[in-house]
Amino acid sequence: MDKFVTHLGKIMPLRRSDVDTDQIIPAVYLKRVTRTGFEDGLFSAWREDPGFVLHNPAHAGATILVAGPNFGTGSSRQHAVWALRDWGFKVVI
């Protein structure tokens, strides 16, 4: 993610708690050798649900992800950050 002081953008609420890095991007997507192109793996298991927030047109173009408690727990993997960035998020709260 890029460093900045102020960011104004559209929010996307992720109303889930205890989201670990394997839910953010499953291990099957970690085989790439580049640091880009991970957006297809972002929340891939949940994206099968047509009601999942990423499919909501009201949140299209959101750059701020409002996450629940314990977001990003689990094994350390920079791919989770890359997937969020590649989707277009600039801020995670």
UniProtKB/Swiss-Prot annotation:
EC number: 4.2.1.33
Species: Actinoplanes teichomyceticus
GO-annotated molecular function: 3-isopropylmalate dehydratase activity
Reaction catalysed by this enzyme: (2R,3S)-3-isopropylmalate = (2S)-2-isopropylmalate
Name the record gives this protein: 3-isopropylmalate dehydratase small subunit
GO biological process: L-leucine biosynthetic process
Keyword Electron transport on entry: no
The protein's assembly and partners: Heterodimer of LeuC and LeuD.
Family, similarity comment: Belongs to the LeuD family. LeuD type 1 subfamily.
Keywords: Amino-acid biosynthesis, Branched-chain amino acid biosynthesis, Leucine biosynthesis, Lyase
Pathway: Amino-acid biosynthesis; L-leucine biosynthesis; L-leucine from 3-methyl-2-oxobutanoate: step 2/4
Record bears the keyword Iron: no
Cross-referenced InterPro entries: Aconitase/3IPM_dehydase_swvl, AconitaseA/IPMdHydase_ssu_swvl, LeuD
Physiological role: Catalyzes the isomerization between 2-isopropylmalate and 3-isopropylmalate, via the formation of 2-isopropylmaleate.
Pfam families, sorted: Aconitase_C (PF00694)
Superkingdom, taxonomy of origin: Bacteria
Gene3D superfamilies in the cross-refs: Aconitase, domain 4 (3.20.19.10)
